[in-house]
């Protein structure tokens, strides 16, 4: 019935992002309509009852692709021989919490998860990290899982890309399908770099349609950078459904790529074509090669505005890295 079966782990299984994401996963949005799924849903001890409710809903959804659904509070059981992991669970930033405090708390979580991945997951497993601060959490997990391939760790910048994509399409009054090569560099934070200089509308440079450089630099860029905070202020909660959709799209770009598609992802900077420091997780434009492997899109020019923003984002990533210990 199935062309293959993949074993998939999802952490933070009782949270809102996972709740939205799991149904897209079960529907086949990521691995396709012919791939069976052996699903393991993890959350911390004390969440057993909520986990059982999530499993009930997946059972009630009668998803043909779900060959097995296991809920667990054991990381080893969740990660055992998996092909892919979606690391969603993390400690949210609370009132009065400094970023360094958040880095410390989540650093411990992702160090533990990295160690278990290292012993339990398949060497070729792809790891998608969502929990914030996502670049540094991804870097911590990667460095605690040296048996796994470093190139297969991804920090999610797709939500930032989607936000930028939507804003550009609305401003240009064109369908989303008309906008391509939407690129977000750097850190998933308020210092990310939404790079409009690479974007195309109907295959032409964006400035031919949106000539207002002031809007691009001083309205669009900061709006994308601060969109997460704006959602929290308006909704009272952080992004969930849009984050889940972005995660599904990020993974689908790898498992079911469209020819020529660019996608933004936080990946290991080792041997990157832009001369950035190695051993960090940095947002780059990527594309699939048709072999199941991706490459960082090389040779893109940076004007003075983008170059300045890039340095700010790089400095933040390096500061975060220096503030945590492995």
Curated annotation (Swiss-Prot):
Q: Give the UniProt family note.
A: Belongs to the LDH/MDH superfamily. MDH type 2 family.
Q: Fetch the InterPro entries from UniProt.
A: L-lactate/malate_DH, Lactate/malate_DH_C, Lactate/malate_DH_N, Lactate_DH/Glyco_Ohase_4_C, Malate_DH_type2, NAD(P)-bd_dom_sf
Function, please? Catalyzes the reversible oxidation of malate to oxaloacetate.
Which GO terms of the molecular function aspect are on file? L-malate dehydrogenase (NAD+) activity
Show the stretches that span the lipid bilayer: none
Which gene is the coding source of this polypeptide chain? Answer: mdh
Q: Which residues bind substrate?
A: 93, 99, 132, 163
- Catalytic activity as recorded in UniProt: (S)-malate + NAD(+) = oxaloacetate + NADH + H(+)
**Annotated positions binding NAD(+):** 12-18, 106, 113, 130-132
| Record's protein name | Malate dehydrogenase
Q: Does the keyword Signal apply?
A: no
Q: Which residues form the active site?
A: 188 (proton acceptor)
């Amino acid at each position: 019935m199935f062309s293959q079966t993949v074993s998939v782990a999802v952490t933070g299984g009782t949270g809102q992002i996972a709740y939205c994401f799991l149904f897209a996963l079960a529907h086949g949005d990521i691995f396709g309509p012919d791939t069976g799924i052996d699903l393991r849903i993890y959350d911390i001890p004390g969440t057993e009852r909520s986990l059982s409710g999530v499993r009930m809903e997946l059972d009630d959804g009668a998803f043909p692709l779900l060959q097995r659904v296991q809920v667990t509070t054991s990381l080893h059981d969740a990660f055992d021989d998996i092909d892919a992991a979606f690391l969603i669970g993390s400690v949210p930033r609370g009132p009065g919490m400094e970023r360094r405090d958040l880095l410390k708390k989540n650093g411990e979580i992702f160090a533990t998860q990295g160690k278990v991945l290292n012993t339990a997951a398949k060497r070729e497993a792809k790891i998608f990290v969502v929990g914030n601060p996502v670049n540094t959490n991804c870097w911590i997990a990667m460095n605690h899982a040296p048996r796994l391939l470093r190139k297969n760790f991804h920090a999610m910048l797709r939500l930032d890309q989607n936000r930028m994509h939507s804003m550009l399409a609305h401003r240009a009054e064109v369908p989303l399908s008309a906008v391509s090569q939407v690129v977000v560099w750097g850190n998933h934070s308020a210092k990310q770099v939404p790079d409009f200089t690479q974007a195309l509308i109907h295959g032409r440079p964006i400035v031919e349609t949106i000539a207002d450089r002031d809007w691009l630099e001083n309205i669009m860029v900061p709006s994308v950078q601060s969109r997460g905070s704006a959602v929290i202020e308006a909704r009272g909660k952080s992004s969930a459904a849009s984050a889940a959709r972005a995660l599904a799209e990020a993974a689908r770009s790898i498992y079911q790529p469209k020819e020529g598609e660019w996608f933004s992802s936080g990946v290991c900077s080792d041997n990157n074509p832009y001369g950035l420091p190695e051993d960090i997780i940095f947002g780059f434009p990527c594309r699939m090669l048709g072999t199941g492997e991706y490459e960082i899109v090389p040779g893109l020019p940076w004007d003075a505005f983008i170059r300045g923003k890039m340095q700010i984002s790089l400095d933040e990533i390096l500061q975060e890295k220096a503030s945590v210990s492995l």
